[in-house]
C-alpha cells in the first residue's frame, strides 16, 4: 500500500473514531447516563455544566473528523485552510497522545478500558494521516 492510500485509510479510521466520540458526547449532552465513562467517571449522570461541555465537544469532534479526512487526502470540507491541515493534525495527534496518558491514569475503570485504546488508535491514525497525508504545497 502506498503512503497516499495509507494516509487516506488512516484519515478515515481517525474520522470514524472522532464521529464515534462526537456521538458519545452528544448523547451525554442529551442526558444519557454514561458519565462513568466520561469527565473523570465520578457520576453516572453528569451535571448541566458538563452536559454543555459535552455538547460543545461533540461539535469540535466533528470538526476534527473533517480535518482528519481532508488531511488524509479526501476531497471534503475542513474547518482549517489546507496550509494549516498538517500542523493542525500534528497538534491533534499530540492532544490525543496526551489523552492516552490521561485515560490510562483515570480512576475510572470504565474510562481506562474504553478510552485508553480508543485514544491510542486515534493518536496513531492522526499521526499517520499527518505524516503521510496532504502536503500544504500539494494542496
Where are these regions (language model features)?
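Interfacial loop at the N-terminal end of multi-pass membrane proteins
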Residues: 2-11, 29-54, 74-78
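Interfacial segments of alpha-helical transmembrane regions
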Residues: 6-19, 81-89
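Core segments of alpha-helical transmembrane spans in multipass integral membrane proteins
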Residues: 16, 20, 24-32, 45-73, ...
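Non-cytosolic membrane-interface motifs at loop->transmembrane helix junctions
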Residues: 40-47, 80-82, 108-119
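Hydrophobic alpha-helical membrane segments
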Residues: 86-100
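Membrane-helix boundary connector in multi-pass membrane proteins
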Residues: 100-115, 134
Amino acid at each position: 500500500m502506498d503512503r497516499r492510500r495509507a494516509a487516506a485509510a488512516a484519515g478515515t479510521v481517525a474520522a470514524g473514531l472522532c464521529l464515534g466520540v462526537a456521538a458519545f458526547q452528544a448523547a451525554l449532552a442529551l442526558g444519557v447516563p454514561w458519565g462513568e465513562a466520561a469527565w473523570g467517571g465520578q457520576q453516572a449522570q453528569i451535571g448541566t455544566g458538563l452536559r454543555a461541555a459535552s455538547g460543545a465537544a461533540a461539535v469540535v469532534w466533528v470538526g476534527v473528523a473533517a480535518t482528519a479526512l481532508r488531511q488524509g487526502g479526501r476531497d471534503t470540507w475542513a474547518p482549517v485552510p489546507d496550509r494549516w491541515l498538517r500542523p493542525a493534525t500534528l497538534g491533534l495527534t499530540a492532544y490525543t497522545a496526551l489523552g492516552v496518558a490521561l485515560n490510562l491514569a483515570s480512576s475510572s475503570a470504565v474510562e481506562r478500558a474504553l478510552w485508553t485504546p480508543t485514544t491510542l488508535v486515534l493518536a496513531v491514525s492522526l499521526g499517520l494521516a499527518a505524516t503521510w497525508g496532504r502536503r500544504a504545497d500539494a494542496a
